């Protein structure tokens, strides 16, 4: 357990309005502050899960969201509630020492991690904490050394994967890798990114640098990835999906009592060692449930930038989405709820909804200014 950051009444708290909140740097939204928690190694025990559930109810509006970066975030936190929330979570080793350490510890770990992967993630976290690398807020690492990578489609800039004979280090956007001798190699690749101008203006991603034709030394073929699994039984336990990635506090408590939890970037939780999960509010265990085809941000009024309500609309359209397809309903053109292309995207505008086919929320629309009543006819 680390020492809790000392936040006192009247202390200045850095509040951001962009896409990258933290626990120590919350984000202002339409329903209050958003506080994002990064569980160490992507793991939660029952006490930690209970503390998060308690904090959501005591200091927020009770909403807990699973993010696409395998974190959790609490919504509806009032400014006066932030300090006691941080203190409560610090008692369970869920808070970093300061904002800089929190920002650097952006590590995505495969939920199917074994002891080797856990040790790698811990060593990488320690090396990042000891470094002074001025990495952009979204710059992240993926520890994915299983027999087959499962995180290749998920956000990371530097990836640790397994080749035929040894661990590999790969820059995102390149299909060639280099041997990994230690986590110091991962930090060296991050320094290379900075030295090559990848973070001009304090922003930047590895894939964007690679797209400019700047590439690190790498000659080994990267392993072929597999798509992420759906909810249900896996060798390590049970994967539990949540509608729109939102987990009710008591569901989080109950799941954690059934086994240690592993975070995923797929808005699911892995309950380690479980062979059966009882029905719980918000839980989706059927891999063909139509709600799994939906992506939607919180929408209005939770987000001040959203121009329409999103999730009830998405639910009403779920049965119209073919199996294997994705419908994304976005409250604005930023597309926070799903940064990827979707088979159909509905983007709210001041004139109604725009329909984008096989694209993202800000892409050119096939139809514009649609009323919600028109949507079932055009999907």
Regions found by a protein language model. Name each.
Residues 81, 198-227:
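Terminal amphipathic helices with adjacent charged low-complexity linkers/tails
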Residues 173-201:
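Internal alpha/beta scaffold segment
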Residues 2-13, 29-170, 175-180, 184, ...:
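Small-residue-enriched alpha-helical segments and adjacent helix-cap loops
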Residues 351-379:
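Glycine-rich, small/acidic residue-mixed loop/short-helix segments
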Residues 97-101, 194-203, 372-379:
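Flexible helix-coil linker/hinge segments at domain or subdomain boundaries
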Residues 78, 178-181, 201-209, 213, ...:
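Short, solvent-exposed coil/turn linker segments
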Residues 7-26, 227-229:
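Intrinsically disordered, low-complexity polar/charged tails and linkers
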């Amino acid at each position: 357990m680390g020492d809790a950051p000392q936040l006192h009444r009247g202390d200045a708290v850095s509040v951001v309005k962009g896409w990258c909140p933290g626990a120590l740097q919350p984000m202002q939204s339409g329903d209050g502050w958003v506080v994002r928690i990064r569980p160490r190694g992507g793991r939660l025990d029952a006490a930690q899960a209970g503390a998060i559930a308690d904090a959501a109810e005591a200091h927020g509006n009770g909403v807990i969201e699973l993010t696409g970066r395998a974190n959790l975030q609490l919504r509806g936190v009032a400014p006066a509630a932030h300090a006691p929330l941080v203190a409560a979570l610090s008692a369970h080793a869920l808070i970093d020492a300061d904002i800089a350490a929190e920002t650097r510890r952006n590590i995505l770990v495969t939920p199917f991690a074994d002891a080797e992967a856990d040790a790698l993630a811990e060593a990488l976290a320690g090396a990042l904490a000891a470094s002074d690398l001025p990495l952009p807020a979204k710059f992240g690492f993926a520890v994915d050394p299983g027999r087959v990578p499962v995180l290749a489609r998920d956000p990371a800039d530097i990836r640790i994967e397994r080749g035929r004979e040894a661990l590999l280090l790969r820059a995102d956007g390149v299909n060639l890798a280099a041997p990994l001798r230690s986590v110091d190699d991962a930090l060296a690749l991050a320094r290379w990114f900075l030295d090559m101008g990848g973070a001009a203006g304090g922003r930047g991603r590895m894939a964007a640098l690679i797209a400019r034709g700047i590439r690190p030394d790498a000659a080994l073929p990267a392993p072929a990835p597999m798509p992420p699994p759906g909810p249900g039984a896996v060798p390590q336990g049970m994967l539990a999906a949540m509608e729109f990635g939102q987990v009710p506090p008591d569901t989080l408590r109950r799941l954690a009592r059934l086994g240690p939890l592993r975070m995923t970037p797929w808005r699911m939780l892995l309950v380690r060692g479980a062979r059966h999960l009882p029905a719980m509010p918000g839980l989706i265990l059927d891999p063909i449930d139509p709600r799994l085809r939906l992506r939607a941000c919180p929408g209005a009024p939770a987000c001040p930038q959203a121009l329409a309500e999103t999730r009830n609309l998405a639910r009403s359209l779920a049965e119209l989405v073919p199996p294997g397809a994705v419908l994304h309903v976005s409250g604005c053109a930023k597309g926070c709820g799903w940064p990827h292309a979707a088979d159909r995207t509905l983007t709210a505008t001041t004139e109604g909804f725009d329909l984008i086919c096989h694209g993202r929320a800000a892409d050119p629309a096939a139809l514009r200014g649609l009323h919600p009543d028109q949507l079932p006819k055009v999907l």
